[in-house]
Structure formats: C-alpha cells, structure tokens
Curated annotation (Swiss-Prot):
Record carries keyword Zinc: yes
Function noted in UniProt: Plays a major role in decreasing resistance to glycopeptide antibiotics. Overexpression confers oxacillin hypersusceptibility, without affecting the levels of resistance towards vancomycin. Could be involved in virulence. Overexpression increases the levels of teicoplanin susceptibility. Overexpression also increased susceptibility to oxacillin in methicillin-resistant strains.
Protein source organism: Staphylococcus aureus (strain COL)
The protein, known as: Membrane-associated protein TcaA
Superkingdom of origin: Bacteria
C-alpha cells in the first residue's frame, strides 16, 4: 500500500493514478520501495541463519571460561595451592576443614599445632616444594595413587592421594594427616576430661593399664585437661610429642598441679614392719620407705599419720596437717613414734613371754613324758591331768590310748606363744615316733593357781 501525496488516499503499490484526485504516481519510487523491501527480507533470512551460529559461539566461549574457572579452583595444582595458602597464612580453620575425614574430625587447635609442627620439622619452603612435586608426580603417574610428605627425621606428616576426579577432567587430590594414639598409664583409676575434635571428651583409665586417649595428627601437644582420682580433682595439661615416637602410639606426660608425699618414720625400730601403715586423708595404706603416696591436689590441705604394731599392740603417731601452700610436686614429711613408750611395752611383753615360754617348756616336757607313758602302759591316767576334762581333745586322746594309736613324742621346743586372757596359743616343734620333726599348734587354758591344761591341737 501507498498514500497519494496530494490527497492522502490509500492505493495499491501497482496503481499509477489516484482514483480520488487523479494524481499520477512516480513509478521509480515504487520500484525503489519494492527493491528495499526485498533486500530487507533477504537480510532477515541471513540473520536468522546466523543466530544459531552466534549462540553456539557464545556458549563455546562460556564453556572455555568455565573450564578455566574450574581449573583455577579444582585442578590438582589449585587444590595444592589452597592447602599451601592456608598453612602459610596460619589459617587453622581452613587447615582443619581440609584435613578432617569421616573417621577423624580435626579441630582448629589441632590444626594450629599441626601448622607449627610442619614449619618446625619440615620448614615451610621445603614443605611447599615437596608437596608440589608430589602432586605433580601423582597427577602424571598412571600407577601411583598415594605418597607421603616427611619430616627431616623421616616421619610421615602428610598423605597425598588420588581420590577420583572432579568435573570429569581433574584428578581429585586428597590430603590426610596420619594419626597416632597418645597413651596414658596411671598408677590408680583416673578420669581425664579434655577437648578433642572440637568436642569435650572423657577417658577413664584403669590403674596400671595402658589406655589410649584418642587419635591425633602430628604435632607437639599441650592440651588443657582435668583429671579425677579418689584423691581429688586436678587441673593441668596432657603433653605428648610425635618426635618422641616411632610407633603407632606416643606416651603422654601428665603435667598437673599435684603433690606426691614421701614419708619417713622415726622411733619405729621395735614395730613389726608388715604392720606399719600410713593414713592420708582418712585412707589407710601399707607403709614403704621407698614409696611415694599420691598424687594429691595442691589446692587442698592434707592430713597424715602412721601406725604400727609391737607385740600385738598398735601405736600411732600424731596426725600432721600439710597446708596447701606448703605442698610441692615432691613433698617430704617425717612422722615420729614415741620410741620410749614402745620400748617399755616391748620390754614388758618380752619378760612376760619369757616367763610364759618357761612355763610352757616345763609343761610340755612333762606332757611328752606323760604322753609316752600312757602309750607304753595303755593307761590314760598318766596323761589325763594335762588335758582339760570335757574338751574334745580329752576325749580324743582317751580314745587313742584305748586303741593303742596314740603317737609318741619327744624333744618339745616352744617356737612361739601368745596369751589372750586365760587362753594361750603355742606353736611347738616335736619329734614324732618316726623320727620326723613336726610343728603343732596347741591351745591351752590357764586355770586357778596358774595350772595349764590342753584344750585342742592341730598341725601347722
């Protein structure tokens, strides 16, 4: 369609004269317009053909850009750079994230220790060089899948391994720190509380039993901890150093605010060694001059005393109090017995025992003769006065005499004797009719006018 320039009437393109005003249209202008429309149509067709190619080219450019972006963050070299940057910048949180595995969670404090250990035991420059070389070799190798970075002393400090691929094109490198188990071996049952893997942890170790406290990556550790025993609660640290271990475990050194007590006794020479006891905070224990007692918390007073027996009588020292301010890791204390009191008692008892032994020697000399006479004469009356009537021993000897089964005895020796009230226990060494030496224990009763009579006997 076209418009008449004179009256504005619409007309078809091929019309030469306006039907309304008779104006004659210019044929050249119509031809030009037709040619222009055909050119536009042709250009539109060309543009429509070029659009898919342009889109494809744009997508290709995007893919290339994306590839380089992915390579910058996911290639083995990029993965290495992330770890190196974290260690160089002491980024303990990033290192903890990179080294944590499903089985072993590494917290930021462990990572901090690990970073320092690398710098001290490998050297940052050497570590970076070793790591880059290791990653490069693994990336190029078709057979090797893992390798270790080591310290100057040859200990493994980082495991580098292939772990599948990232985005099809890039080898996925896995960085894992090897672990060891720190072990404790307390003298008594102990509960340890500390932080590990970002969480609070509690370990209970039995007395004199090796107990691991967890899995830790390489480092020199000084972990804040609390420990509890029957003696109290202690604040301090658990210390262990990977440099001091060539095995899968590493010994823990305990560093707590504790006191160990060494006890010296004076005035105890007359006491029976096996009877000596030490009582600390109401807890009684056997005494040994070579033993240290504890540990005990350094923030609480300690009460201590000692006891021992002489001739079955118990003697005790005064109770001493060691102030918390006087407690040290190794604390020595001396406890004094009243030696004069003990010696007087022992002397008195020894006189009594000698007197008793003399009586028993006389008694058993007569008893052995009477026993043998009863055997030879088959007459119980010879020995009856030495045995308490009504006792089981009385009836037993009487029966043996009648049956002729009474044993002959000779050469009685008093080995030991104790008196408790009117009862006396004596260990007597005899020679029987077969010529064999035997020890027998007799129980006697002391009656009126100090008369002794046997109640029972048994083999030692």
């Amino acid at each position: 369609m076209k418009s008449c320039p004179k009256c504005g009437q619409q007309a078809q393109d091929d019309v030469q004269i306006c039907t309304q005003c008779g104006h004659k249209f210019d044929s050249r202008q119509a031809f030009y317009r037709k040619s222009t429309d055909e050119d536009i149509q042709t250009n539109n067709i060309k543009m429509r053909k070029m659009v898919p190619w342009a889109i494809g080219f744009f997508i290709l450019i995007l893919i290339i850009i994306l590839f380089f972006l992915l390579r910058n963050f996911n290639s083995p070299e990029a993965q290495t750079k992330i770890l190196v940057n974290a260690i160089e910048n002491n980024d303990k949180q990033k290192v903890a994230t990179l080294l944590s595995t499903k089985d072993n969670k590494v917290d930021s404090e462990e990572a901090k220790v690990y970073i320092n250990y690398i710098k001290d035991e490998v050297g940052l420059k050497q570590f970076v060089s070793d790591l880059k070389n290791t990653v490069h070799k693994l990336n190029k190798s078709k057979t090797s899948v893992a390798s270790y970075i080591q310290t100057r002393s040859g200990q493994n400090i980082l495991r580098v391994s292939k772990n599948g691929t990232r985005y099809i094109f890039f080898d996925n490198m896995s960085f894992t720190a090897p672990t060891k188990q720190p072990i404790v071996k307390p003298k008594e049952k102990t509960k340890y509380e500390f932080k590990s893997g970002g969480k609070k942890k509690m370990v209970i170790a039995e007395a004199n039993k090796v107990t691991p406290i967890g899995n830790f990556i390489p480092g020199t550790y000084r972990i804040p901890a609390m420990k509890s025993t029957e003696n109290g609660d202690f604040a301090g640290h658990l210390k262990f150093d990977f440099r001091q271990s060539n095995s899968e475990t590493v010994d823990v050194t305990e560093d707590f605010e504790e006191a160990n007590i060494s006890v010296t006794l004076k005035g105890d020479t007359k006491l029976n060694d096996s009877s000596k006891k030490v009582t600390i905070n109401d807890h009684e224990m056997a005494f040994s001059s070579s033993k240290t007692y504890g540990p005990y918390p350094q923030n609480k007073d300690i009460t201590i005393s000692a006891s021992g027996k002489a001739k079955d009588k118990t003697f005790t020292t005064q109770t001493k109090t060691i102030k918390a301010s006087d407690l040290k890791y190794n604390t020595e204390i001396t406890l004094n017995f009243d030696s004069e009191d003990i010696e007087d008692y022992v002397e008195k008892k020894e006189k009594e025992e000698n007197s008793l032994k003399n009586k028993l020697i006389e008694f058993f000399a007569g008893y052995s003769l009477a026993n043998n006479a009863a055997f030879n004469q088959s007459d119980f009356d010879f020995v009856s006065s030495y045995i308490k009537k009504g006792s089981s021993f009385y009836d037993d000897v009487k029966k043996r005499v009648s049956k002729g089964s009474l044993m002959m005895i000779s050469s009685p020796q008093i080995i030991d004797a104790e008196k408790h009230g009117d009862k006396i226990t004596a260990t007597v060494r005899l020679i029987n009719e077969n010529g064999k030496q035997v020890d027998k224990e007799y129980e006697l009763e002391q009656g009126s006018q100090d008369r002794l009579q046997l109640i029972k006997t048994s083999e030692k």
